[in-house]
Amino acid sequence: MAAVDRSRTEISVLSDRVTDVGSVDFPGYYFDEDNIWDLDKFKKNLKVSITSLDQETMVFEISGIDASIANAFRRILIAEIPTLAFEFVYIINNTSIIQDEVLSHRIGLVPISADPDMFKWFQHPLPGQEATHTDYDTVVFSLNKKCEFNKNAATDEKDPKRLYVNSEVYSGDLIWKPQGRQEERFADNPIRVVNPDIVVAKLRPGQEIDLEAHAILGIGQDHAKFSPVATASYRLLPTIHILSPIEGEDAVKFQKCFPKGVIELEEGPDGKKQARVADVRKDTVSRECLRHPEFADKVQLGRVRDHYLFSVESTGIMKPDVLFIKSIAVLKSKCLAVKSSLQNISSD
């Protein structure tokens, strides 16, 4: 591919700078070319493929979209998909070393496994009014732990976990208390904390924690505890163009400039080792090869402008593929809202 053609589809990565970073697919950028956005062309170019998927993480590729759309998906995944999290903590007794507000904050960050589509938004009361909770907008958990000496512990025991009973309070100690018809509605998939092994507090004999926590719907834009993802990120697909053969010892040196699996060595026509690109997706674009003058005119690095490698790591509240589908629905609703507003402006 000619250099001028690459500038249309790729970002050039040089030793000291990055060039061709601006979008070029709009009318007027190239002389005598019609680059008007076309829906059929967009559908043809749009491609999505899942690389790996399990209960917590998903890696997938999406191409044929602008960076603004890719970033919109990332931001929606982080901040705009509704989930349940603890919002109200009513402390009955807390004689631990952790202050009430710190304990409440730690409990608030514990992820809850509950389908948010089964709940309504909680209506916060006006100043001076009392909150009204229902079984359709609130989930109630209780925690009651008291630390005592273990009567069966050895006299020379030093391990607090054996010396005491309930020396540590875990997220799994939060017990769901069904309200109204919740037990019936969630009979097949009871509400629970995602990870029961999160340490919430440590106790010593005589110390006690007794509280009730209420969870409601929210979004990460309001507080990070509502965010359904631990990470949601993307990077552009790297490109490595070998302009002229790299052989012999140079090929071995060239291979070492990249992470394992990016460059492979094969036997060339003359029997010498020759470098070839094996898997660009493993490249971190460190530009190490550009530090060596012998490769300056033999390789060109870049990134495909509209090809994104997405990585989504769920907190366990929902599967990552479900989260991405929900992000599409949120973006669609935003577009419909803008469309409706524009129609109202035009009608006025």
From Swiss-Prot:
TM spans (from-to): none
GO MF entries: DNA binding; DNA-directed RNA polymerase activity; protein dimerization activity
BP terms from Gene Ontology: transcription by RNA polymerase I; transcription by RNA polymerase III; transcription elongation by RNA polymerase I
One GO location term (cellular component): RNA polymerase III complex
Subcellular compartments: Nucleus
Gene3D superfamilies in the cross-refs: DNA-directed RNA polymerase, insert domain (2.170.120.12), RNA polymerase, RBP11-like subunit (3.30.1360.10)
InterPro entries: DNA-dir_RNA_pol_30-40kDasu_CS, DNA-dir_RNA_pol_insert, DNA-dir_RNA_pol_RpoA/D/Rpb3, RBP11-like, RNAP_Rpo3/Rpb3/RPAC1, RNAPI/III_AC40, RNApol_insert_sf, Rpo3/RPB3_RNA_Pol_subunit
Alphabetized UniProt keyword annotations: DNA-directed RNA polymerase, Nucleotidyltransferase, Nucleus, Transcription, Transferase
Major place of residence: nucleus
Quaternary state and interactors: Component of the RNA polymerase I (Pol I) and RNA polymerase III (Pol III) complexes consisting of at least 13 and 17 subunits, respectively. Interacts with RPAC19/RPAC2.
Gene: rpc40
Function: DNA-dependent RNA polymerase catalyzes the transcription of DNA into RNA using the four ribonucleoside triphosphates as substrates. Common component of RNA polymerases I and III which synthesize ribosomal RNA precursors and small RNAs, such as 5S rRNA and tRNAs, respectively. RPAC1 is part of the Pol core element with the central large cleft and probably a clamp element that moves to open and close the cleft.
Family: Belongs to the archaeal Rpo3/eukaryotic RPB3 RNA polymerase subunit family.
Organism expressing this protein natively: Schizosaccharomyces pombe (strain 972 / ATCC 24843) (Fission yeast)
Cysteines joined through disulfide linkages: none
Listed name of the protein: DNA-directed RNA polymerases I and III subunit RPAC1
Source organism phylogeny: Eukaryota, Fungi, Dikarya, Ascomycota, Taphrinomycotina
